[in-house]
From Swiss-Prot:
Protein localization: Cytoplasm
Reaction equation(s) it catalyzes: Hydrolysis of terminal non-reducing N-acetyl-D-hexosamine residues in N-acetyl-beta-D-hexosaminides
Gene Ontology cellular-component annotations: cytoplasm
Site residues, Important for catalytic activity: 174
E.C. code: 3.2.1.52
InterPro entries in alphabetical order: Beta_hexosaminidase_bac, Glyco_hydro_3_AS, Glyco_hydro_3_N, Glyco_hydro_3_N_sf, Glycoside_hydrolase_SF, NagZ_Beta-hexosaminidase
GN (gene name): nagZ
Protein name in UniProt: Beta-hexosaminidase
Family, as annotated: Belongs to the glycosyl hydrolase 3 family. NagZ subfamily.
Pfam families, alphabetized: Glyco_hydro_3
Length: 337
């Protein structure tokens, strides 16, 4: 089992990164804005990552749209999830969700990037870090728009990752800088926040799920990403999820209360994560690679599935009529946001 997804520092690989990529625990790389200058540079970086890894590995990015879009120049400007329904009826919003996801996925795949960590399934509530990254505060609207978005991703050949299970929208604190605590009752969480995940799992729409670094104090005292209650009892057993569980970044402040990076990695895997993100802290990531002991799990085949649906486009995107049509729709929408 190769469970660790890491980051790289810049536009090109340094000597340490070339060595790290060949480590037997490395499953993938997540890219950030700092890794992008232009499309040709990005393609060269991805090619080098794959070459030095030796084994096939995942390359991912957060490319939701709106304020969370890592690559901008020469990529289509993508709308935030929340903007889709603000000025449109549901039929139009679903068409835009599909188009946005298809364009996002096709442009990333054209650069040999496997997937974006999307969509956000949190309900829009009091969370400043979520806000319009969420489709809506309505369960029905969230499920409908998310399903259209996922269909767009899959039509282009990309898998989906629903986040942040079981819901990050009802806490004010940002788990990047604090440990949010959601003190609502189990009943409220299960009748509201968890519903988009539950419904999309029933539909077989989700390939992967990313849990939050939030404590739901009336349910369990561990953050969800380190909680066997949330990942095993609820997600796997109660909701019947068969896909891949990917931790949020273990370097986030919301994960620091579990211990050092090795303890975080061990706890996340023990709780039920199949893949773990260790970003923006090289020494912490190296300590995981040097010391983590893992065993193969039943999810190893599912982890491989994250890259099995990737397509390569025969036509260049600027000559692909589907891309041209969808891009034009998004350009019209961009005038509204």
């Amino acid at each position: 089992m190769r469970p660790v997804i890491l980051d790289v520092e810049g536009y090109e690989l340094d000597s340490e990164e070339k060595e790290i990529l060949a480590h037997p625990l490395v499953a993938g790389i997540i890219l950030f804005t700092r890794n992008y200058y232009d499309i040709e540079q990005l393609k060269a970086l991805v090619k080098d990552i794959r070459r030095y890894a030796g084994n096939e590995l995942l390359i991912a990015v957060d490319h939701e749209g709106g304020r969370v879009q890592r690559f901008r120049d020469d990529f289509t400007r993508l709308p935030s999830a929340g903007s889709l329904i603000e000025k449109n009826d549901m039929k139009t919003a679903c068409e835009l969700a599909f188009s946005s996801a298809w364009v996002m996925a096709s442009e990333l795949i054209a650069c040999d990037i496997d997937f974006s960590f999307a969509p956000v399934l949190d309900l829009n509530g009091i969370s400043n870090v979520i806000q319009n990254r969420a489709f809506s505060s309505s369960i029905t609207e969230t499920v409908t728009l998310a399903e259209a978005y996922i269909n767009g991703m899959k039509s282009a050949g990309m898998v989906s990752t629903g986040k942040h299970f079981p819901g990050h929208g009802s806490v004010e604190a940002d788990s990047h800088t604090a440990l949010p605590v959601d003190s609502r009752s189990e009943l409220e969480i299960f009748t509201k926040d968890i519903k988009p995940f539950e419904n999309l799992i029933k539909k077989g729409a989700l390939d992967a799920v990313m849990p939050s670094h939030v404590v739901y104090s009336q349910c369990d005292l561990q953050p969800a990403g380190f909680s066997s209650y949330w990942l095993d009892d609820v997600l796997r057993t109660r909701l019947g999820f068969k896909g891949v569980v990917i931790s949020d970044d273990l370097s986030m402040h919301g994960a620091s209360f579990v211990g050092n990076h090795l303890s975080r990695a061990e706890s996340a895997i023990q709780a039920g994560c199949d893949l773990i993100l260790a970003c923006n802290d090289r020494s912490g990531a190296v300590s995981i690679l040097d010391n983590l002991k893992v065993k193969p799990t039943a999810q190893y085949h599912a982890v491989n599935q994250l890259r099995s649906t990737k397509n390569k486009f025969i036509l260049p995107l600027n000559k692909n009529p589907i891309w041209i049509k969808n891009k034009q729709m998004l350009m019209q929408l961009s005038e509204q946001f």
